[in-house]
Every structure is written in C-alpha cells, then in structure tokens.
C-alpha cells in the first residue's frame, strides 16, 4: 500500500523523488493502528510516508488512510470522505500550503512559477477550502479562518516569525496528536472546527492533484503548517514537518515523502507549516488529488477519529529510522488540539490569529519576499539582531543558510521552532520541548531583536546550524539533535548568555557551545563540516544537474538517487533547502552527506527559507555559497549594524564555515585566534566564533579548540585585551579568514593588530598586517587598536555593545563583514555613530571591562576573580599605557602616518578632493571599493586599526572617522572653508583617519596627550587654518600638531578638542553623511573659542558629552540642522578668516546643497550629526564665549530636508543649560537688537512656525541666514543669533536651504507683513517663552504645536533679535523649538485643520503667551482661566476690546509698531524679549481676559467677525479676521497662526496675523466674547464631530453638556470612544465643558441655532434656536439634530429623554446619526 501509494503519488507528484521511506512512513501513518498516527513521531515517520504518500503513495495514502480512517471508525469518512475531505482538504491545505508555497514561490522565483501555478490551479480552489479546514479547527470559519492563519503565517509569517512559528507548531500539532504539539495546539485548532474542518477536509474535495501537485512544495515552505502536507509536493514540504512539532505527523510523512528538500531543517520548517494540516488531511488531499497517491493525510476529522479510535500508545512506537528529537517529539503522544483544550497561550494565539493579530507563525518568514524568501534584509535583520546570541546568530547564520533551503530551518525550527513557537506554548512542547523552548527563550533573549520566531530559530538555528549541517543530515543527526537538545538545553543557558550577552558571554555561550560541541551532534558537526566540505568537494561535479545524488530526508531515510536536475528542481520548487543532506550516488555508502548548498553552491543563491521563515538572504546565500563572502560586501554598507555584519559574517561563515573553519582552526592553531577563541566563544560564536558556530558544523571542534586555546591563552594573558583579543581576534581571524582571505587580510592586519592589541597578541595579529604594520610599533598599533577597539566599543551603544562586544569583534566582524571593503571598522561606524556621543574612552573602558568581565565570566569562567581583576587592572593599565604609548607612538607614528597618509590623503583627497559630496561619496565608495588597497596601505601605513579600519571603514565609518578627524581638525582649525567643501573632498579619509585616530585615541584615552594633541593640535590647526582642508592640512600638519601634543599640552584647548572629539565622534557619523566639512567647519569656527575657553570647553565638553548622549537622539535631527546651519554659520563666521568663512558659507551652501543633491540621506545624516555638533558647539561656544558663539553663528545653507521631525528635544536640563549658555553668550552680545531686522523675517517665521516647525526652522534659519546674508545685521548679530538660536538654527539650518528660497518668498511676505510678523513673533516669543514652560501642560499637544509655531516664530524672531531676553528666548526657542518641533510633530498631525478645542486653547495660550494659555484647561499654572476666569477674561477682553490696543500695547503695540518696521520689531522684541514674561503677563492678562476667552474658543476675530462680519471665517479664513489689529488679536493671530499652521500656509498666517491684530481691534463685548467663545466652541465641536462622526451633528456633545462630567465622559466614550481612542477630543470637550461658562456653552449651541444660525444652516438653527431658546435641550439636541435632519427625536432624547439617552449612552447615537 505504501509502495503503491508511493509509486503513484511519487510518480505523479514527486516525479523525481523516490518515496520508499515515505511509503514506510506512510505505512505508519496510514492507520490509527500505526504506532504514531498523530504523534510527532508518527508524523515524523509520516514524513517519509508522506514522501511516499505524497510523492508516491498519495492514492495509497488515501487508500491506506481510508483504511486507517475506517479502522478508526471513520469508515464512512474513510476513503470517500477522506477523498472528499482530502480533495477539499488538500485543496484547503494545498491552498494554504499553496499560499505558503506560493509565498515560497514568490520568495523563490523558480518555485513561484511552479508553485504559484500549482497553487493557482488547484491551490486556490482547494486553498480556500483547505484554509477552511484549518480554520475549522480554529473557528467556525473553517476554510477562511484556517487559511487565513496560514495565509497570515505565510503572508504575515514573514512579518511575525515567532507567531507563525507558534502557530505553525500549533497547526502542525493540531493536525495530528503530536505528542507535544497535538496536545494543545492541535486540540486547540482541531477542537474549534475539527468537525467542520473534517467536513471541509472531507467535504471539499477540491482537486487535490492540482493543488497538491503544485502546493506540496509550497506547503513545505509556504504552508509551513499542514498545507505542505496537503500538497502532494508537500511530501517534501512535509518533510519539513518533521522538524516541527506542529505539523509533525503529517508534514513529517510528507517530508520523508518529500523530495530532497526534506533535507534537515529547510523542508522541516516548511513542513512544519505543512504539518499544521492533519496528516489525514494530507492523505485526504493526496487521495482526493487525482492521480496522486493518497498521501498519508488524514482530514482533521479522520485524524481525530484515528486518535479517538486508536490507542495512542500504539503509535508511541516510532517508525523505523525515526529519530526522536525532544524538541520535535514527545515521549508520549499528545492529544490532538481538537481534543485538547488549548492552553491560555494557545487560546491567546488562536484568538490573535482569529482576530488577525497573528497572521503568521511569527517565524521570520520570507515566503513573500521571493524565492530566497524575504528581502535579504528581512531575514538578515532578525539575524542581524541575532548577533547578540552568537550561537544563535552564528547558528542563525548557518540557519539562515539553511533557511535559504527553508527546510534546514524548518527542521531545526521543527525542533526549535516548536520551542520558539511554543515558547508561548509550553503545552506544545512537553518534556524535552521545554528545554529547547528555554533554549530558544534565551536565544530569543539574546536575539530579542530578532523576531520572536527568529530568536527561537536562532537557538534552534544554532542547533539547526549544527543539526542542519549534520544532524539533519542523518537520522542520527536527529538523535544527535535530541542529545543536541540536551546540549542545547545547556546552550539554552548559554544562549541566554549568548542572546542576552550577545556574544559577550563566550563562556556561557562557549560553554554551552562547547558542551554542544562536546555533544555528539556538535562534535560531529565540525567533522561533519569538514566531511561535508570534503564531500562537497568530492560531490561537486562539473555540472550539478549531472550529479546523481541521494538525499537524506528528515527521517534520516536516504532517498534517491536523483539526478541533480531533479534535486535542483525540487529545491527550486521549495521541497527542501540548501541544507538538504545529499550525497553523490557514486560516493561510498559510508560517505557523509553534504549539504545541498555545499554540493550545489549555486543553489544557495536560490535557496529560500520556507514561506513562514525568513530565509537567509541571497547575500547570505551568496556569501554562504560564495564563501568568498564578503558578508558585509553589500550588507555592511547597506547599513547593517555590526550585528548585521555579524550575521552576514555568520551567514558567510556558515556558508564559508567549512573553509572558514579550517582557516579559523588554522588560525587558532597558529594562535592568531587563540584569544579570539574566546572571542569565538564569546563573540566569536557570532563573530569568529560565530563563524565557527554558523559553521558550527565544524565550529564545535573549532570552538573547542578555540576555547581551549583561548582559555589557555587568555589565562596566560591576563590583559583584559586578551579578552578583547579573544573577541576581536576571533572576529578578526575568523572574519578575516572567513570573510576574506582576499581582502580580509589587510582588513585583518589592522583588525589583527586591534585584536592582538586587544588580545595582547599584537604580534600575533600584527603578522597579518606584518607588511604594512611594521611601520607602526606593535605597542602603538596595540594602543591604536585598543583605542580603535575602544572607539568602536564606545561608539557602540552599550546595549549594542554587549552584542557588539562580541561585535566589537565586529569591528573585526565588521572587518569580516566589511572585508569586501576592508573596512574593519565599517560596521563599527554605525555603532560609532550610535555611541559617538558617548565618551569613547569611558565606553571603551566600560566595554572592555564589561566585555572582559563577561568574557571572563562567560567564556573564561575558569579565570579566577584574580585573573579577572588582573585582566581589568591590566586592561586599565594597558589602556593607560596604550594611551600613553599610543599617544606618543601614535603621535610619532601618526605623524609618519600623517605624512604618509597625508600624501595618500592628498591623493585620496584628490580622489575625494571634490567638495561635492557626490564625488566625495563616490570617493568614499571608491574607498569602500578601494579599502582593500587603501586598507592594506593604511594598514601598512597605519598599523592602528583605526586607520586601516577607517580607511577600510564603510562609508559610514570612513565618513564618521573622516568627520571626526575633519571635525577635530575643523574644530581645531578655523578654516571651515576647507572643511565644508574639502571635508569630504579635501580631507582624505586616510588623513582623517589619522586625525580621527588621534581623536579616537584621544577620546578613548583622554590622556593629557590627547588633550595636548587636541589643544596643541587644534592650536596648530588653528595656526594652520590656511590649510587647504582641515583634513588635509590638519592631517598634513597633524604630524606637527601631533608632535605638538606630544610636546605641548593645553588642557583647555584639549578640553575643547575633547569636546570636539565627542562632537567629532558624533559628527563623524553625522558629518560622515552630511557635508563633513560643515560640521567640521562649525567646529573649526568654534575652535578659537575653544582655545579661548578651555575651561568652558571642558565644561562644554562634559556638557557636550552629556548632551551627546542625550542629544544623540536629537542630534540626528539637530545636527542635521546644525550641520546645515553651523557650517553656514561658520562660513559666516569671520573668525580666523571671516572672508574664508563667508566663502566657505558660499561653498558650504554649495557643498551642502551639492551634498544635498548628491546624497540627501547623507546630508541628513550629516545634518543630524552637524546638528548635534552644532548644538554641542553651541554649548561649547556658549561656554567658550562670545567668540565661540560668533563662530558658531554659522549660516550654512542648511539641508533642504527637515530633520526636525526626527528631531528629539533636549532634556530640560540640556535646554536650560543651553539657555543659560545662550543667555550668557547672548548677554555677551545683547547689543544686537538690530536683529529686529530678522524679526521682520522672524515675524513670518512666526507664521511659518505655526505652519510647521521645519518651516519655522527652515524659514527661521533662512531668515537668520537671510538676515545674516541679506538683512542688515552685524555679524555679531548673526553670531549672537546663531549662538542664541544655534539650537533652533541647528533645526533651521538644514531647513535653510529650503527656507532660504521659501524664506525669500516668506521674506517678501514678511516684508509685507514684517511689522505684523514681528508683532506676532514678539507675541510668539513672549508666548513661546512661557509656552516653553507651560507647553507641556494639559494642552500639551496643542500647546506644543502652538508653542512650536510660536516658538518657531519666536525662534525666527529671536534669531534676529539679539536681546538678552531674546537670547534666552532663542535658547529657549532652540530648546522649545526642538521640543516644540518634536511635540508639534507629535501634536501637529493631531491638530485638526479646522478650529479645534486644542486650537482654541492654543490660541489662548499663545495669545496669552504660555502662562495664561496653560490656564485654558488645567494644563498650565494658568488654570485660573477657567469658566470664571473665562468670564473674567471675557470681561477683560471686552475691556481690552474697547482698549485692546492699549492693554496689549506692550506686546501688541510693539506688534503694531513692528508691522511697519521689521527692524523696530527689535525694540518690540527687545521689549517682549527683555520682558517676555511681562509681555506675556500683560498680553496674557489682556488677551487672556479677552483673547483667552476668544482664543480659548477661537480667534477673537472669529467672535468679532461672527458678530461683526457675520461670516465667521474658519481658521483657514483667518485672514478675514486677520484684518483686525488688537493685542488680543495679535495673540489671536498667533493662535490663529497656530491654527493656520495646521491649515494655512505661512503666508496666510503672516497675512492673517496682522489681520488678527485688526480683528482684535474690533473689540468685543463680553457678550461678543462669550459669543466668540461659544462660536469657537461650537465650531470646534462641529469640526470634531465632523471629524469623528462624519457629520457636524453635535447633538451628542450638546447633550453631554447637559450631563455631569462623568456622565458626559461615559456617554462620549460610548459614542466616540472608538473614534477617539485616545480620548483626546473627549478630554478636550470635557475640559471645555468644565472650563466654559455655562452661558458660553448655552450660547455656543444656541448660537448654533440662532447666533450662528446663518452659518449653521440658519433655517434649521433658527428653527431649533427658537426651540433651543425655549428649551436648552431642544436647542442643544434639536438644533444639531435638526441641522442633520436626523435624530429630531434623538434630539429629544438629547433633550433628556432617558430612552434615547440610554441609547445614546449606549453609543447608538452615532449609529443613528450615521
């Protein structure tokens, strides 16, 4: 029966697959009498059978299955029903599988054509049914829901790998009473729709042949859950089911039946999803499939019947050749999910699946992304994340390679995935399962970054890597896997360390790994790797298609021989992955099986993970396949973190693991990696160890060797760097060897030096770089390396650092990842960027200490505390010594390097010399391409790995380094000219590298040497400002400056350099992307001040360091702006050479613009960096003094883009500090009140600010730039302005480019509205100052936006205004603008375009200038403005209306005066700025009394117009009201500007602001004020109702006004809660309800009918107004209802009728209204 079924099915379906084992398996699976019909073991046997059944014995399966089913008591449902079910079920399953497969096909183009066709042909039809079946298990929606989950698994599986894994495991288990999975998952799934599903399975007899044939493969990967089982191709797919406990039984059979794809892992994973289909279902499908051998697929019903009818104990016997894998199998049969109540986790998952929250197993499925599976990024990113868990990451790399095949992953996933997927499903995995789950959980911990599925996968991946490589190769591998599971139980812990420490725990990892490696499977794996490698070599024929291969299915059964073309076809069809264990038919029987990817490396590029799994990226495959492998070739540059690099390396290593392992072992033998063995264990597991790990196949032995060697060496080498070396050496050696024999050696040499230095094995690593490095003394190299490593470490965030500490090895691994680029530090650069702000030195020490401790604790637990202490002490001593030696030697050597590099840099600068970033980028790209050359050269020239790495550094690293150096030079050198345009072009990255090296070393070892170097170097740079380019000249002169530092030490200057260094670190990455020169220019401009203010600089440095940390988030945005503007400012700064600076400004603008044109992204990055630097510079400058501020006053054509959105506000402390500094700096130059000139500009800015922060910033920056450039403004003014508003300038700078154009337009508008703008700005400024404080209050978001607007305007105004108050304001502006921008970014989107309660509140606040506005609700200290205060305010407003000009005269008068005079605005600004609080209090009291009420509910003009103009213009028509001039109106204008910012352009705001002022003049009586408030409130309610309910019917709101707050809140939540999930509107409304006087509320809705009747459908409104006048409720409810023409009766209910009220309260009003 098995044979016949196998014959027919295999012939029909698995044309190339011999499914004899499947026959056997099918036999087991055929009947419930089989020992393990539903158990995972049964499923596992079933895979072989499924192969038979699916491939050959599908009809037999059905026949057998029918028999079995009949035997189980499904006689009626036996073959016929099964066929029906199977036909239907297979269709569903096939469809689902097909969908997964289809994803897989999509993932794999080759598969997609076949599978998609198949799926389209039969899978579609049956797929839905199939899904129904599956869903039957889950819910009444049998077909769709079930399928939906699969689809989700398939579709979303990629998104949610972990959920899908869980889900798949559940599906798999639910398909059969897997011992583990079936318990709950299966019961869970089966129970809900087991009957329906069975019926579906039986009933829908969709032509399974169609679906089955094309689905089978797809299911193995795409279906991932029972689908694969159902696909006839599924046998292969189901082969994957073996690995998963989920669909184990069915998929397993299919797997064994499945084609070679059933190779360990890939097909297993694939089958795991497939397994989700009940084996019977698969049989049914196969049976139903015409011409298809009845697969041993039971419909769920039949499976359940089998389960019910058969004694599960009889199935406890495992099929012959069945390998018990704890993670995949349970000692005892598990109840089908249909029979078992799902666990709470399962229930949650099921619910989530039904709700669509979980659309996939959560496994990183790449099925959607193409044959390879996902975007390489998709999978690599989880992997990328994985670097944390070196094992898993490494294994994950291997795993990914396997994932490429999909089956490898699937299989290990089956083992681990169940764990992972079952992590939440403990019941799924009983017994052994738990350890793996635990393992995976640690793995997940380590790889928390990775998708949840990815983490478990990682853990399983480690296992899988081993197992996939070998265990998966053999049935014995499974046994090993079992033992491996035990081992992995250890690894579990180790993985916890691995994942948790992210390769920092070489010991825990290493021990676990070593345990694992000690574990037979692990031990076996290394040899397997070698054997496989050898075998692969043996196996590889001239033409893969010509090969005759046996493959080992997950059952461990040898299938075949099959032609290579068949194997390839199956592989492409997704039946198995590159991890399929194959052996040449001609190979001896005892010859080891090799991975298909090894035998057919070209398939690696094609291999894709199962649909539910993120497959290794094609890059990985390429890397794996082309073990040449620059895993980071594209990926490192693609911005992968070192983690990604690690993953790439791991990937690569896994692929190239055999070769790399050999090399690694050789290196270990050579001792080069001896310490790296620790790295191998700790990080190496991910890095070099990871190389071994991914290569865990041979890595276990390597790790053992490395571990022993490393431990011995590390023990022998107390220096903490021995640990570093271990890690880095591991990284370097394995990475270098793995990644590139070619490019990696040069990369390696610096890395080796680094590693050796870190390891204390300088000689060891230096030999790699022996040729070029000899120039450098080992100690120096060591120091450089140490510093470089530190830099990398410090650059690396600590969170990342743990991952990276191993990944610090990533610098090495980066080398590995970047060997292509020979950019050992290339990967680090991102980290460097990340940690740039951190004190490199401290970070380095901390990292070294932490890493060393971790390494010692983890990898070298044997090390005694003394050793650890010694290591730490030695590390510190070494660090100190290295600092000193490095300082000295690096100074000398760097001088040499600088001389050498300078020539190189000149050449390279000539290469890069083009100021344009595009060229620079090209040059950088060239550097990346040239790194091997340059790297070798640099390595030769500069042993300091930093140099090498920097040269080889990725663009990111190179740029950051270059920026750092350039910035350092720039900071030290005033010539911002050179830096701006020449930073990239002129400064050779290599030159920069030496500088950066100096900086880095200085940073790392903040010895006086660094300080001296920094100070003296800076001084020399200053003296050398004429240098063509800071980089060039600096580098050129660096030799001298370096010697200077050696001889000289100006602590103060040094402090500035340190600050600069920290900045540079930040800027390095930042400038790296943006015009490096700009930031450098900024710094260079600052340098004199730095020297001048050494103490300040020290403070500033500290502050900068703090900020750098704090600002990192906002540095990106701020520095982006700062970079744009700071360079401009520097250019503008006439410090050392104002002419040059101005030239630079032009150049910078060009350069910045060019950079923008060339690489906006880089510009953004550099801008962000520059912003940070600029902020830091501003701080430093403020600290340093006026000169600094002047220098900082650089108007750089900021980047066109707006970094503001990403801009992160500084902490209040930072802001306060900045304000203080700015205040000081501005106080130094309060003289510049002439900045009023820019106030005119600023006025528009106020309007623009309301428009958008970026606009404000842009325009403000443009304004400041314009003011500086075009407006009559002393440079001291720009300086002060820049200093004051440096932060906002930073924000505005990048905007400047855009803003300059916009600004010109705006300036024209401003010129027209200068006075008003100034007034508005003044109000905004005053308001903003308070807003800055009060903006965070209850109306925080609104105030944020308003504040952002006003603050933007204020900033714009402040930029021009140089008053101390303005300066402080500008500081606050900068801060508040940043905050406001952030807040506004947060808030503005939420701000309704029309008048909103927030707008009213904001207007109030703005009009009042934050303190009063805060009172609007309870948000501010000004809460006094509550109903009573509103009334008072109304009265005051009336008074103010009558005498509105005088009361607000302080601000408004100025404003009035200002409108005519943009420059006089300075006075008003001075006035408001000098006493913003006074102006605020005045205008706030005045405009609050009047404007607040008006503004609270809307612009005062609105009320006025409503009363006077009758046509109450909306906010968008504020220009109408804008004609009114009243301080209150000005405030209103400000608020209006805010609203306009939401809805109107800056021009409109600008125009409307004066108009608003006029509107204020129209004066309003208290009634008018109340009416205005009422109208504003009503309009706001309408707008909100329209927004939330889609209609202006405010009946609910009116009714709520009649209710108590709690009742109203309840009602509103009932009615609007779904539409206002955040309850923002509800809260606002309730606040208004509480704050508004009852009369205002009455007026609001009466006026709706009457007062605003004309506006609000007067007829109805009046009609209801009469009613409203007579009856409040009638008025309230009836009016609005009447307006709608709906709910008139409802309005009656609104009037208070309980029935309707209850309905309303029930939220039915909305329904009724709708």
Swiss-Prot record:
Q: Which UniProt keywords apply?
A: Cytoplasm, Necrosis, Phosphoprotein, Plant defense, Repressor, Translation regulation
User: Which Pfam family is one of this chain's hits?
Assistant: GYF
Q: What is this protein called?
A: Protein ESSENTIAL FOR POTEXVIRUS ACCUMULATION 1
Q: Matching SUPFAM superfamilies, A to Z?
A: GYF domain
Any GO MF annotation of the entry: mRNA binding
Q: Where in the body, by tissue, does this protein show up? A: Expressed in all tissues, mostly in flowers, leaves and stems, and, to a lower extent, in roots (at protein level).
Disrupted gene: resulting phenotype? Reduced size with a curly leaf phenotype associated with an abnormal constitutive PR1 expression. No spontaneous lesions, but enhanced cell death independent of salicylic acid (SA) biosynthesis or reactive oxygen species (ROS) production during pathogen infection (e.g. P.syringae and F.moniliforme). Heightened nucleotide-binding leucine-rich repeat protein (NLR, e.g. SNC1, RPS4, RPM1 and RPS2) accumulation and enhanced resistance against virulent pathogens. Enhanced snc1-mediated autoimmunity including stunted growth, increased expression of pathogenesis related (PR, e.g.
Basic and acidic residues: compositionally biased ranges = 96-136, 143-203, 389-422, 430-441, 464-483, 1142-1162
Q: How is it modified after translation?
A: Quickly phosphorylated at Ser-39 after treatment of seedlings with the pathogen-associated molecular pattern (PAMP) flg22.
Question: Which Gene3D superfamilies does the entry mention?
Answer: 3.30.1490.40
Give compartment(s): Cytoplasm, Cytosol; Cytoplasm, P-body
Q: Which SMART domains match?
A: GYF (SM00444)
> Ranges of Low complexity compositional bias?
1467-1488
Phosphoserine modification sites? 39
What's a single GO CC term here? cytosol
Q: Where is the GYF domain?
A: 546-597
Q: What species does this protein belong to?
A: Arabidopsis thaliana (Mouse-ear cress)
What is this protein's function? Translational repressor involved in the negative regulation of immune receptor accumulation via the inhibition of nucleotide-binding leucine-rich repeat (NLR) receptor mediated defense. Represses NLR protein accumulation (e.g. SNC1, RPS4, RPM1 and RPS2). Together with SMG7, helps to restrict effector-triggered immunity (ETI) cell death induction during pathogen infection in a salicylic acid- (SA) and reactive oxygen species- (ROS) independent manner. Required for pathogen-associated molecular pattern (PAMP)-induced suppression of necrotrophic fungal (e.g.
């Amino acid at each position: 029966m098995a044979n016949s079924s196998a014959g027919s099915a295999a012939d029909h379906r698995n044309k190339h697959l011999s499914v004899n084992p499947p026959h056997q398996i099918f036999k087991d699976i055929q009947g419930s009498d089989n020992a393990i019909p539903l158990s995972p073991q049964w499923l596992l046997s079933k895979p072989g059978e499924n192969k038979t059944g699916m491939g050959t014995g599908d009809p037999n399966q059905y026949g057998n299955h029918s028999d079995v089913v009949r035997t189980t008591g499904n006689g009626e449902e036996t073959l016929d029903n099964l066929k029906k079910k199977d036909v239907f079920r297979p269709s569903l399953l096939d469809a689902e599988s097909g969908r997964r497969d289809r994803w897989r096909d999509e993932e794999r183009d080759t598969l997609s054509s076949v599978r998609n066709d198949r799926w389209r042909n039969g899978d579609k039809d049956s797929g839905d049914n199939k899904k129904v079946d599956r869903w039957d298990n889950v819910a009444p929606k049998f077909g769709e829901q079930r399928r939906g989950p699969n689809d989700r698994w398939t579709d979303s599986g990629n998104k949610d790998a972990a959920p899908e894994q869980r889900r798949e495991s559940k599906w798999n288990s639910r398909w059969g009473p897997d011992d583990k999975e079936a318990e709950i998952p299966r019961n869970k799934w089966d129970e809900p729709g087991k009957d329906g599903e069975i019926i579906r399975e039986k009933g829908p007899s969709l032509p399974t042949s169609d679906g089955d044939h094309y689905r089978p493969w797809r299911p193995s990967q795409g279906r991932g859950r029972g689908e694969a089982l159902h696909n006839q191709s599924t046998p292969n797919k189901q082969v994957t089911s073996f690995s998963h406990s989920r669909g184990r039984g069915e998929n397993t059979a299919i797997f064994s039946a499945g084609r070679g794809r059933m190779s360990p892992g890939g097909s297993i994973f694939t089958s795991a999803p497939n397994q989700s289909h009940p084996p019977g279902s698969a049989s049914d499908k196969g049976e139903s499939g015409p011409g298809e051998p009845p697969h041993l697929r039971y419909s769920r019903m039949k499976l359940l019947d089998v389960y019910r009818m058969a004694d599960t104990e009889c199935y406890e016997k495992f099929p012959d050749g069945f390998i018990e894998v704890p993670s995949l199998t349970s000692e005892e049969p598990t109840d089908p999910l249909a029979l078992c109540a799902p666990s709470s986790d399962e229930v949650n998952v099921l619910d989530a699946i039904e709700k669509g929250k979980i659309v996939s197993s959560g496994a990183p499925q790449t099925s959607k992304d193409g044959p390879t599976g996902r975007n390489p990024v998709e999978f690599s990113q989880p992997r990328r994340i994985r670097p944390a868990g070196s094992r898993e990451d490494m294994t994950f790399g291997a795993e990914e390679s396997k994932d490429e095949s999909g089956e490898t992953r699937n299989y290990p996933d089956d083992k681990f995935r169940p764990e992972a997927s079952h992590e939440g499903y403990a019941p799924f995995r009983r017994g052994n399962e738990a350890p793996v789950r635990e393992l995976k959980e640690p793995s997940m911990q380590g790889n928390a970054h990775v998708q949840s599925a990815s983490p478990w996968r990682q853990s399983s991946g480690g296992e899988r890597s081993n197992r996939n490589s070998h265990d998966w190769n053999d049935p014995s591998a499974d046994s090993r896997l079992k033992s491996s599971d035990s081992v992995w139980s250890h690894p579990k812990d180790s993985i916890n360390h691995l994942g948790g420490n992210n390769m920092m725990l070489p010991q825990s990892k290493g021990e676990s790994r070593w345990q694992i490696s000690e574990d037979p499977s692990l031990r076996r794996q290394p040899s397997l790797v070698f054997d496989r490698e050898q075998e692969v070599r043996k196996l590889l024929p001239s033409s893969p298609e010509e090969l005759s291969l046996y493959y080992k299915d997950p059952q461990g059964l040898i299938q075949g021989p099959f032609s290579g073309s068949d194997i390839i076809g199956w592989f492409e069809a997704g039946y198995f992955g590159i991890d399929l264990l194959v052996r040449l038919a001609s190979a001896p029987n005892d010859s080891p099986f090799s991975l298909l990817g090894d035998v057919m490396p070209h398939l690696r590029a094609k291999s894709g993970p199962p649909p539910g799994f993120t497959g290794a990226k094609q890059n990985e495959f390429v890397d794996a396949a082309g073990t040449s492998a620059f895993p980071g070739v594209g990926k490192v540059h693609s911005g992968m973190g070192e983690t990604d690099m690690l993953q790439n390396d791991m990937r690569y290593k896994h692929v190239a693991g055999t070769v790399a392992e050999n090399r690694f072992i050789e290196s270990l033998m050579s001792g080069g990696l001896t310490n790296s063995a620790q790295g191998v264990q700790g990080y190496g597991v991910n890095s070099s160890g990871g190389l071994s790990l991914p290569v865990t196949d041979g890595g276990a032995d390597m790790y053992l060797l490395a571990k022993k060697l490393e431990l011995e060496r590390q023990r022998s080498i107390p220096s903490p760097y021995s640990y570093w070396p271990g890690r880095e050496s591991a990284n370097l050696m394995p990475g270098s060897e793995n990644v590139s024999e070619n490019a990696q050696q040069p990369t390696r040499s610096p890395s080796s030096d680094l590693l050796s230095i870190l390891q204390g094995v300088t000689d060891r690593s230096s030999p790699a770089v022996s040729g070029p490095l000899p120039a450098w003394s080992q100690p120096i190299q060591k120091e450089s390396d140490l510093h470089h490593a530190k830099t990398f470490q410090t650059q690396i965030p600590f969170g990342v650092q743990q991952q990276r500490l191993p990944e610090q090895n990533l610098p090495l691994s980066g080398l590995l990842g970047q060997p292509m680029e020979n950019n050992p530090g290339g990967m680090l650069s991102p980290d460097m960027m990340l940690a740039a702000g951190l004190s490199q030195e401290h970070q380095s020490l901390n990292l070294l200490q932490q890493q060393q401790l971790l390494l010692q604790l983890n990898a070298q637990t044997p090390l005694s505390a003394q050793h650890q202490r010694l290591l730490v002490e030695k590390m510190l001593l070494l660090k100190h010594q290295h600092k000193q030696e490095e300082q000295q030697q690096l100074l000398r050597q760097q001088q040499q390097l600088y001389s050498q590099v300078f020539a190189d840099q000149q050449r390279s600068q000539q290469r890069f010399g083009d100021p344009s970033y595009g060229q620079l980028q090209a040059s950088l790209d060239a550097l990346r391409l040239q790194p091997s050359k340059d790297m070798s050269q640099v390595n030769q020239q500069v042993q300091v790995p930093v140099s090498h790495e920097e040269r080889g550094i990725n663009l990111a690293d190179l740029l950051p380094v270059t920026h750092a150096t350039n910035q350092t030079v720039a900071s030290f050198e005033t010539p911002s000219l050179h830096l701006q345009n020449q930073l990239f072009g002129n400064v050779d990255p290599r030159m920069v590298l030496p500088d950066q090296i100096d900086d880095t070393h200085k940073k790392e070892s903040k010895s006086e040497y660094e300080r001296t170097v920094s100070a003296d170097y800076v001084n020399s740079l200053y003296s050398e400002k004429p240098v063509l380019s800071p980089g060039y000249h600096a580098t050129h002169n660096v030799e001298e400056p370096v010697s200077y530092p050696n001889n000289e030490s100006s602590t103060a200057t040094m402090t500035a350099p340190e600050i600069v260094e920290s900045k540079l670190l930040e800027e390095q990455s930042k400038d790296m992307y943006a015009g490096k020169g700009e930031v450098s220019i900024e710094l260079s401009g600052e340098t004199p001040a730095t020297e001048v203010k050494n103490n300040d600089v020290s403070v500033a440095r500290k502050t900068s360091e703090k900020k750098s940390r704090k600002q990192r988030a906002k540095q990106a945005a701020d520095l982006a702006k700062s970079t744009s503007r700071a360079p401009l400012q520097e250019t503008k700064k006439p410090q050392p050479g104002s002419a040059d600076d101005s030239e630079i400004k032009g150049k910078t603008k060009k350069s910045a613009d060019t950079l923008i044109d060339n690489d906006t992204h880089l510009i953004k990055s550099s801008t962000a960096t520059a912003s940070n630097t600029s902020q830091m510079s501003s701080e430093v400058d403020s600290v340093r003094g006026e000169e600094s501020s002047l220098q900082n006053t650089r108007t750089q054509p900021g980047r066109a883009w707006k970094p503001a959105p990403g801009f992160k506000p500084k902490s209040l402390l930072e802001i306060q500090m900045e304000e203080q500094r700015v205040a000081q700096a501005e106080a130094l130059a309060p003289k510049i009140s002439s900045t009023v000139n820019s106030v005119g500009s600023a006025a528009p800015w106020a309007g623009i600010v309301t428009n958008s922060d970026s606009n404000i910033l842009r325009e403000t920056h443009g304004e400041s730039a314009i003011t500086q450039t075009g407006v009559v403004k002393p440079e001291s003014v720009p300086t002060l302005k820049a200093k004051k508003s440096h932060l906002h300038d930073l924000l505005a700078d990048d905007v400047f480019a855009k803003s300059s154009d916009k600004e010109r337009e705006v300036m024209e508008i401003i010129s027209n509205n200068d006075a008003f703008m100034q007034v508005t700005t003044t109000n905004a400024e005053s308001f903003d100052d308070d807003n800055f404080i009060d903006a965070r209050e209850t109306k925080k978001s609104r105030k944020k936006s308003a504040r952002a607007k006003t603050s933007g305007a204020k900033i714009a105004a402040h930029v021009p205004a140089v008053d101390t108050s303005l300066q402080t304001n500008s500081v606050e502006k900068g801060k508040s603008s940043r905050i406001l921008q952030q807040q506004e970014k947060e808030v503005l989107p939420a701000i309704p375009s029309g008048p909103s309660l927030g707008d009213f509140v904001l207007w109030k606040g703005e009009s009042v200038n934050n303190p009063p506005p805060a009172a609007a609700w309870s948000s501010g200290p000004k809460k006094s403005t509550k109903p009573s205060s509103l009334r008072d305010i109304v009265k005051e407003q009336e008074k103010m209306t009558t005498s509105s000009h005088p009361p607000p005269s302080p601000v408004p008068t100025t404003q009035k005066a200002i409108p005519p005079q943009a420059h006089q605005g300075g006075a008003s600004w001075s006035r408001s700025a000098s006493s913003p609080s006074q102006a605020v209090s005045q205008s706030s009291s005045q405009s609050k009394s009047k404007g607040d009420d008006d503004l609270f509910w809307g612009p005062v003009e609105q009320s006025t117009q409503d009363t006077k103009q009758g046509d109450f213009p909306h906010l968008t028509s504020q220009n109408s009201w804008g004609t009114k001039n009243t301080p209150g109106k000005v405030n209103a204008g400000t608020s209006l500007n805010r609203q306009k910012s939401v809805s109107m352009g800056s021009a409109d705001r600008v125009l409307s602001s004066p108009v608003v002022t006029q509107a204020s003049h129209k004066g309003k009586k208290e009634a008018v004020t109340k009416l205005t408030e009422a109208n504003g409130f009503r309009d706001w309610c309408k707008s909100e109702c329209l927004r939330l309910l889609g209609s202006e019917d405010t009946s609910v709101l009116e009714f709520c006004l009649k209710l108590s707050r709690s009742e109203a809140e309840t009602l509103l939540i009932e009615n609007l809660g779904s539409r206002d999930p955040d309850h923002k509107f509800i809260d606002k409304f309730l606040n208004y309800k509480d704050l508004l006087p009852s009369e205002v509320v009455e007026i609001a809705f009466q006026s709706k009918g009457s007062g605003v009747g004309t506006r609000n459908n007067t007829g109805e409104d009046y009609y209801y107004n009469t009613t409203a006048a007579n009856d409040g409720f009638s008025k309230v409810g009836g009016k609005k209802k009447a307006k709608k023409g709906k709910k008139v009766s409802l309005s009656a209910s609104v009037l208070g009728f309980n029935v309707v009220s209850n309905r309303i309260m029930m939220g039915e009003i909305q329904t009724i209204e709708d």
